[in-house]
């Protein structure tokens, strides 16, 4: 019974630990999830959840306990002990520490066996006593915790003397586990068993009786307790009444209650010169202003006064004018009675050496500084000053471990030394040990603090450590508050300002951060550290030009080694930024060359290598960049955590989320420097934001928000995270919420053009066209000369339907890019490294530069082969063997296939649909039909001239057509015309079709009107209107509809009309009706369906009706920007009211089965290159065709009777059908295109061939890859 109850309760007990607060905040949700996964025996998911929680709050007790418990369960006691130590280090020690300590103890095999024995003992009191003894042997005097405590106290309560202790223990557990119904039930039972507390037990059981988990047990025990109570006293009657309210039919309990109610009714020495006495007293008091004139006056009276010389030496020492002090003291020691000043002289020499060492350190002469400190140490080994100075130098050189050891060594010999103490506090603070620094500060007594140098602001230091600890926990608000407190205590400290400014940055408060740093610069415009921190802020904001300018204001002589290193960092970032911008303009070879020339700037420093590697990723050489960073890690046998984090950053840039995540998980929980902690936090933040964006793009908004929410909790006002959240809301259709999120970002950064464009994008998705327009215009006003801004604004204009304005913006962007490109080429021509050569890549010229430009080399004879050279950026990593597609070509080798800038690509996209052109084609179509009847040879020479008009296009189409069916054979005359015997001659016709067309590409709208070829036997008005658009809710879904009147081109009869030998004319059929279709395509698979209904009308031809239905599905077996392969299944059905597939008078001469079914397997391959695009399509399948019998002369009963009522036989066939089509287009130049197409259709005994060619001339230049798939130009009359 007991064991069964415990098993039921495990889940509830685990959950109760975490349910203290509402689960609306991320931490509470994670606590609940962690205990849930542990209750489900899923340690992997639980560990992942606890690690997420620790990233939010590094000291969160539930997370530390959860991971510790997993280590216990997986038999890793040493790892579990580490988490126990972390819990025990918290103040106050949380209950989870006691629980984990017990779990570790119970997991010891001997204790586990004892626990098993205790649980196996039965109900008799003697066995319970034994069980209690076993439990206590496990606890070893510690207070029982958790589930084991619950079972222990329950067992203890049933022993002779254990009731009171059991009740007290269970009462404690109910406070610790308020949502654990098992604990409440055990406590209620033991209270009910004890006569003194039975009424309390009954009340508790009454409450538990309605509990879903323990209600049945509680209800049963409730009744027993009332029976044990017996007839109630007057104040106990309500206990029975409450039970009877729930169980009104329980006569035994009612009788007991009634019984209780019924029972309740009854000497003379030498004296120093008074002036000298006064001077020395002032000197002792530190009153140098009083002492100096007195000593000077004495020396004026008596220049060899030993005490005056010695006193002046001490005064100069206190003024830190050590050379002068040494001079005075040397004179004093050489006079009679001057031996007393020897120790003062030694002291001055000691401090003079230390002063000189500090000057050397400031000048960057570290070796000389250390030599001077060593001399001072030898001069006075007992003085701590030299050791303190050395530790300070080590701290300045970031040798924090050595500095810490040095300070601690001094304090061991000179406890409480104020300089060593303050130095150690600073080192602990700088080396990422704010907790240790805080403990040390709090241990310093007021008396010790009073001895600190005036420059040591201990209260500011303490607040700074509190801020750093809050920062480590991810509590930005607490960190900001602490740093503000530190700034109040030390307002002139630039580093405290910088710490607070960093918090503002992480909270998205860029303006506040800049104002804070600039505030100090206004009052101290030339203070080196103020300028330095301002430079660092600009660096964090990637404002490299401003960083360079600010750092340049610090005189070279006053720059520290760190400042000089920062100057190199700035130079590298400026170079890489130029390279990235160059690549964005489509000049990838030039960008790679710039990066190659930047490599010496890294000086193999991992942080700089990471910057350069990230830049290679940005310009498209991702693998090369990753290899650079991988070498940094692999070349170090024991790579530091910082180096791993740098590599993870480059992996994130390259969208290698899995590899980056592995490093971040590996680093998690490891000790980090302050810089490492910040880098880790930034990477985790960026990782979550990028992953959230990726999930949003997959339309998994729930997972995207879950991924982003911890990042938002960490930095609730950061533009990156809030922008990602806004995009989620926009994707969900909640544009209002998205714009609400963007509002404070814009308020904080009103002059950020990219933010304005982000707002415009969201406004456009929310159909707020006015805001989209105004935000785009604001961005353009802020950065009118930035090609990237112009290109992005053009995309917004396109979405607003303003394609002409969009094209103008893109042309402006291209003009700016071309101007920049010219400057880059001039710069390259004069720069070292790979030479610029303007003729590389021109028609008939080399595609690489040669080695003839190498300075100092003797050129080979002109008849000798000349080698091509590669950019030094790739010299060691790649080859120029263009025959191997898997080896990336060098930067110069790729110039024959230049990357296009986004502006060029965007303009090409607009122009491709809208630019004017003229095109002349020639097409031929023929079949294997019967001569004179179903045979047709169709030759057309379509011409089209298209012009843009605003955001629309209009076109004029002129299509000469010649049709020929051959001559009707004599034996076929009965099946032609009215069946006369007169020879019909050759069946042919010629004419010219005319039409005008209109198109609005943005609206998916097309319309045309014209006339079928003039000159044909019959011509008529033809045209149509169609629309094809995506659904607004999901652009993967599309719909289309059209209404049209089109000629039926199956034969000469249906297209042009026929005339027999007797002059009878008929034919010229048109299909009049509409078609609708729906489709879905997510770039992985597609489905579609369509339906159409048409009335077929002709001259002297029986009217007919056609109904068609079809659908299909296809899969992308390959889908890349340059090639696609699809395979599908398609089905269609078609029916005509009448069979008109004949050529006698009254028939239309077109394929018109009464039942047509087709099931096919289509496949399509398409590929695109820079100048060539082609596609091949084929389909094979089964077809069933059934045609009813028909009169020879439908609609003319007299003629039908005259001819003895002849009829065509019905037919029904099932067989294999197939088709093949190939199309291609080649760009002859930026304006001339040559294209063509061939096709074959085969259905049982019918076969048709078709081919066409065309030459197109564009009125504007187009570049970039050819469209995929190719869309060949066809005659308006093509099927």
Swiss-Prot record:
Pathway: Glycan metabolism; bacterial cellulose biosynthesis. InterPro entries: BCSC_C, Cell_synth_C, TPR-like_helical_dom_sf, TPR_rpt. The keyword Magnesium does not apply. GO terms for cellular component: outer membrane. PROSITE patterns: TPR (PS50005), TPR_REGION (PS50293). Keywords: Cellulose biosynthesis, Repeat, Signal, TPR repeat. GO terms for biological process: cellulose biosynthetic process; UDP-alpha-D-glucose metabolic process. The keyword Nucleotidyltransferase does not apply. Residues 1-21 form the signal peptide. TPR repeats lie at residues 27-60, 62-94, 218-250, 306-339, 384-417, 460-493, 495-527, 606-639, 719-752, 787-820. Required for maximal bacterial cellulose synthesis. This is Cellulose synthase operon protein C. It comes from Pseudomonas fluorescens (strain SBW25).
